[in-house]
Every structure is written in C-alpha cells, then in structure tokens.
Amino acid sequence: MYSFEHYIHFVDGKVTEENLPKEVVVTDTTITFKYGEPIQLHVVVDVKNEMSLHYVFEDNVHAEVIETRHVEENGVLNRTFTNGAYSHVNFFNENEGTGKNTYLDEGHSSHDSMLQLGYSELSDASIEASYTFELDGEGADVRLRMAALSKDKEKKHYKVHIKHNASHTTGIMDNYGVAKDEAHLVIDGIGTITNGQNGSASHQTNKIIVFDPKCYASANPFLYIDEYDVQASHAAGVGKMDEEHLYYLQSRGLTKRQAMQLITYGYLMPVVEVVDNQMIKERFELALSKVGA
C-alpha cells in the first residue's frame, strides 16, 4: 500500500496510520519537514467531505513526497505548500477520486528553493482544480508537470498559475491532456511576472489531443508580464488524433482499444521526459502504463 518506508494516512483529517522519520513532525493536518537526512514520505489521504492539508518544508530540507488521494463525491481537498530557503522538494500527486472533486493548491517558495511537482490526473472523476504557486524569494524555482485524461462524460478543468514576486525566479509548467468519448477537458496555464522581477523566466506548454467528435477541449495560455528584462514563452494547442496512425497500429495486430491506449500513452509521455527526478519519472510511467488497461 505504501511506496516508501515512511508514511502517514489521513482519513477526513484524522491520522489512522503512520511511520514517520524523526525529521517529520505532524500537528493536526500540518506536516513539517525539518532539516536533517533526506526524507522520503508517502502520504495517503481519504476525503469524504472537505479537508485541508498543510506541507511545511523548512530551510535546507531535501524531500521526496508521494501523495495518493481518494476523494469521494463532492469532496474538497485544500492544500498549502511552504518551501523554505534552499529547500529542494520533489512532490508527486496521484488522484484516485470518484464523482465530482475539487482541488485547491496554494504554494509559497522562499529564496533559492526548488519545488518540482508532478500531477497524475487520470482518475475517474470530474474535477475543478486551481493550483497557484508564488515565487516569493530571489532564485526560487517551481516546475510543474501534469498529465490529464478526461473520458466518458467527465468534465475536468484545471487552472495552473505560477506567479513571480521576486527577481531571478523560474516558473515552468508542462501540461498534457487527452480527451475522449464525450468528455470535457480545459487547461488554463497562467504565468505572471510582476514589476521589478528582472532576470526571471516564465515558460509554459499546454497541449491536448482529442479522440472523439463529441469531446470538448481547450488549452489556454496566459502571460502577464510587467517587466522588460525577463524570459517568457508559451505553447498551446488542441489537436485531433491521427486516424492513419490508429489504422496503422490496428494493421499491426492491435485491437482498436489497444491502439488508442498506446496513442494515449505516447501523447502523455512528453511530460515524463522533461522531469529530471527519478521518483517522479517512475511514478508517471507507472500511472500512464495503466491508462485504458
């Protein structure tokens, strides 16, 4: 059930199981990571109604975290991230919700910190999500990668915002999605560099492939730049599946379902290729290998 030796399991805000290293302190629903040995922690969250969860990474902390969440119909999960100076955190999110779920993330990064996030958005749920990360200290770096699948009649809407409040900060997002059947999938990528934050870089990619004519998909990039000496770019697009590719795979002996599964896997794989952390890479690959299985 747990991917690391150390773990904690919350059910509606109450701890039901735990095996924590000495560097991790839990108070109610706040998990504090203290400086010491590098930390690996698997957090499992079960939400029936609404829950708030707070991650605090103190200065100089090095941590790898996997969060697996099971959110029930109309469940809401609110999370905050506080990243101390010189902290280096790799964080992977696995959604396994059902029904309609709401996710709200807010993060703040201090100077010279690094936060790399992976979002595996492959659940059987309709989702409304807002993920906002603010770079508050010089040299802060946030890199967010998301793979999203919307199928059947699911409706999934993601707003991903990285805001630069300090100079020489880096914010990168790569969001890839697949929509099939009669599903809706909308990804809004937002990069904001406020006045005076020179030397900063904001880059984003938002791409969705559509399998079926009854799907609705939209990939929307927004850049709000109030400073001259910066780097900023965006790439966005919604495209249809290549029917010839599908026919070719079927001619090689695959069923249509197997061929579509392979195409889905291949389209979402670029999100893995841009990740430079082995744990996040492996979790993405494991999640994507189960798509359509």
Language-model regions: role of each:
Residues 1-38:
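Long, low-complexity, mixed-charge
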